[in-house]
Amino acid sequence: MVTLILKNLKEVEEIFHSEIETICKEKKDYYNELFKKYDKDLTLEVIYNKSSALYKVSASLDLKSKKVLVAEEDKNPVKALNKVFSNLKKAVKKQYELERKDYVYKRKR
């Protein structure tokens, strides 16, 4: 089961809040489907920071072996969020496959 934590959303302008929340909930559902047989409860953490004109968005997901963390910067917070989630998807799938490969290797020995 994946739990979603949104931090510092108040730094983002009000007009983007609903769009950001819907994107995050969709991604949470995606990760729930991907990790439905995973035996550890996961937390998907999305953090927003605003410095001058740029939004820095970072997302992390705790897996068994390590914490996968991805960060992006953009002027538009929604674009930055989409970039973060696409990069996080690649990194999480890669790490998940490594964990699976390691598990199968240990099981055969």
What would you call each of these model-derived segments?
Residues 1-109:
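Polyanion-binding surfaces on beta-sheet-dominated domains and ring/shell assemblies
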